[in-house]
Amino acid sequence: MARKKIALIGGGQIGGVLAQLAALRELGDVVMFDIVEGLPQGKMLDIAEVGSVDGFDCNLKGTNSYEDIKGADVVIVTAGLPRKPGMSRDDLIEVNSKIMTSVAEGIKANAPNAFVIVISNPLDAMVTLCQKITGFPYNRVIGQAGVLDSARFKTFIAWELGVSVKDVNAMTLGGHGDDMVPLVRYASVNGIPVMELLEKKYKDKAKAKEVMEAMVKRTRGAGGEVVALLKTGSAFYSPASSAIQMAESILKDQKRVLPTCAHLNGEFGVKGFYVGVPCVLGENGVEQILEFELDAEEQAMMDKSVAAVKELVGSMK
């Protein structure tokens, strides 16, 4: 049985972590593309040389030629400028649109059968542009946002309640921006509603609501919080881990239910746009979109988030 092949477009901070994680999990052979000569070659050589230490055996290659991504089963795109303090994800749209156009053309020409996972910001616009230029079916072009946003939400809940993050279940919907929708009603710890636990902890419904609202606000601004602390870039460990989870579900046909930036065709009342929703990811990419009823408050937040996505995508044309 032939090994799977993962292509990484972009040799920056996220690309380096992606390569290391893909190797550690032995998801397949990995090739990293970047336009800077020597950068992907150096990073991949560095990772390859610890195969005997970390216990992995796969072929790792750095390249400046798109031809080397031929035969890739999954392509993960991180190429683009990162945020700097004070910038929103949307501020990157003009420059990163040009980069994404070039990247998508390279993928289309050299890896026409690949599944594509986009990480580049502004995410909702970049995944839309990537699909448009490649012309790939919608189920094969997706964006990573919700896995990370949900993971951040889970982390803050675990810290607040003093429980293992492994036992927290929570999810965000909508766009990857300030209007994302953390679903408070569905957040739980081993099936116990988080709001119930907060009310028990504080013995005050108003206080519990206030604490939850603070966690929701922090989740929405979590990426910016990292940017402000780093000062010279944006998050890279967490986006890479999140994208690898998505890639692994596709490569191993795991059927994981993961919040994914997927193209909607009427689900959640949205048609013709990429928005974060729970999806089943398997060997066919997006195999199902799990639709469920939102209450009035959730629907209003979702509508606001989708409106922001539409405005963002519209500004790209």
UniProtKB/Swiss-Prot annotation:
GO terms for biological process: lactate metabolic process; tricarboxylic acid cycle. Its EC number is 1.1.1.37. The keyword Oxidoreductase applies. Keywords: NAD, Oxidoreductase, Tricarboxylic acid cycle. It catalyses: (S)-malate + NAD(+) = oxaloacetate + NADH + H(+). NCBIfam families: MalateDH_bact (TIGR01763), PRK06223.1 (NF004863). Catalyzes the reversible oxidation of malate to oxaloacetate. This is Malate dehydrogenase. It comes from Citrifermentans bemidjiense (strain ATCC BAA-1014 / DSM 16622 / JCM 12645 / Bem).
